[in-house]
């Protein structure tokens, strides 16, 4: 039986920093997350266009700021934070800006959060946010920002993020609605 098809009764969530060896699992996890849950919020054309503006950003892995959440050795979720200007997008997304942010002046970025559809609503997103916020705070950042999909927005609102601006990204050929959100990090 496929390990993802088994019912999960009790989960033991573990986390670690992702490595290059995790790239195949990360790609599969992101593909499932984009294909599944986003379809409740976007048209099929928007879901397909999302693939152009979302995905693995290997800079986060190289910077050692990208977490992999596992359940019994299975990749269940991933996400990270960054001290770089880029707010969202994968290696293939045009317009990335690798310049560094300044703690205490700029907001750290929460980046590329995905949960496999089998593991939705089990605390994985909250766990990733906690890891990212704690790491950013430890590096001297007093606030974080992220760009949310329509599917992720409810999680971020529940975690005290506030809307900064709504916009659309049409680099995938169809406008995809997104929300820039932010949060103050309280010590």
What are these regions (language model features)?
Residues 70, 76-120, 135, 168-177:
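Conserved acyl-donor/pantetheine-binding loop and adjacent beta-alpha core of acyl/acetyltransferases
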Residues 65-68:
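Hydrophobic beta-strand residues of extracellular immunoglobulin-like
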